[in-house]
Amino acid sequence: MDENQIILVDKPAGISSFGVVAKIRSQLKTEFGHKVKVGHTGTLDPFATGLLILLSGKMTKKSNEFLKLDKVYKAELKLGYTSTTGDIEGEISKYPNSGAFGGHDREAGRSARDDGPERPVPEWGILESTIGSFIGEIEQTPPKFSAIKINGQRAYKLARKGTDFEIPSRKVKIYDIKILDYHYPKLKIRCHVSSGTYIRTLAEDIGKKLGTGAYLTALRRIKIGDYNVKDAKKML
C-alpha cells in the first residue's frame, strides 16, 4: 500500500483531532515499518463526531487545497440556555427570560419562571425566518475557545487562563441551513458552510436572534467538499 494517502476517518466523540492523527500515525508506522508523516486538514472539537481528512507522506503538501473546501454538518442545539464554550463542555446557564415549559429547571437549578416575564417559545415560522436570515455571506466572530492564534498563542489557552482578549470578526458564507427537527428546546439543523465557519458561533447567533440563547449539544461533520463520512473508516 502507498504511504502517500488521503485518509478519511469517522471521528468518535471524546477524542481530539490530534489524538486521531497520533493513532493513524502509529498504525502507519506499524504497517510500513518506519515513521510516516501524517497531518489533518481541519480539526473537529473533541465532543464532535464525523469526517476528518488526514493526509500522509507526500500528500501532506496538499493540505491547503483541502482546508479551503466547503463543509456540511448536522448540529443539535438546545435553546433557552447558553454555554461559556458554546457547547456541552462549558458551564451551562439559563438564558434570561427565555421561553420554557415552567416548573423546575434542572440544568440551572432553579424555577424556569424566576427571571420575570418570559419570551414566548419561538414558533416554526419565526424559527424558519430567523435561520433563513443567516444564509449568505455573514460576519462571524470565532469563539474564544478555539484553535485560532492570538499573538502566537492558541485562543483556547488564553481563555482558560482568564486572559482578556478579542478575536476579530471575519466573513464566512452559509450556503444553506435546513431544519431537520424542532421540539423546543431541542433544534436539529443541517448546515452547508464555507471553510472557516464555526457552527458553535452560528448556534449562539441563532439563539441570540431568537431571543432564547442556544448552545450545541451535538455536532457531526458529514461532508468536506465531495468527500463523505459514509466512505470514512471507523476509529479502532
Task: Please place each PLM-identified region on the residue numbering.
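Catalytic/RNA-binding core of pseudouridine synthases
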Residues: M1-R106, R110, D114-L236
